[in-house]
A protein has these predicted regions:
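The feature primarily captures lumenal catalytic ectodomains
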Residues: 1-145
Length: 145
């Protein structure tokens, strides 16, 4: 029974992941893979679609991730292994970036009226660059549900 539930989690996580590339086929192995981690309850990226379109227009490969479906740790690690830059709202999803390679970057969008430095310490100690974008405008803040 437990294996069956684990298999469902693996496939739900993989099936919810979408890869976006430019239509003209100019994306290649030398281009950065940018992961956009979206949450759907609290702290989600309000303009995720615009963000993805802008990145694809610049010829980046975008991996659109949704871990709210209940990803297992091995699946999460597999999905993040080729991500060069992870963009996510501040929260537990940022912690998943520990599965990214050293010398990669994490961009945390903090729209909660406060900031916590905990993730900064973990990622910089692991050899990743960590940037915190603190949104102070009500235009980009999402209320708790």
């Amino acid at each position: 029974m437990q294996k069956k539930q684990a298999d469902k989690r693996v496939f739900a996580c993989i099936n919810s992941t979408k890869i976006y590339t430019s239509d003209n086929g100019e994306n290649d192995a030398n281009n950065l893979v940018i992961g956009v981690l979206q949450r759907y309850r609290n702290r989600y990226i309000l303009n995720a679609e615009e963000l993805i379109n802008a990145l694809v227009k610049q010829k980046y490969t975008v991996k659109f991730l949704n871990f709210d479906v209940g990803c297992s740790l091995p699946t999460t690690a597999k999905l993040l292994e080729d991500v060069d830059v992870l963009i996510s709202s501040h929260g537990n999803g940022i912690g998943d970036a520990i599965f990214m390679a050293p010398k990669t970057s994490v961009l945390s969008i903090d729209s909660r009226f406060y900031t916590e430095p905990w993730f900064t310490y973990v990622h910089t100690a692991s050899g990743r660059r960590f940037y915190n974008f603190e949104c102070v405008s009500s235009d980009c803040q999402v209320a708790d549900i």
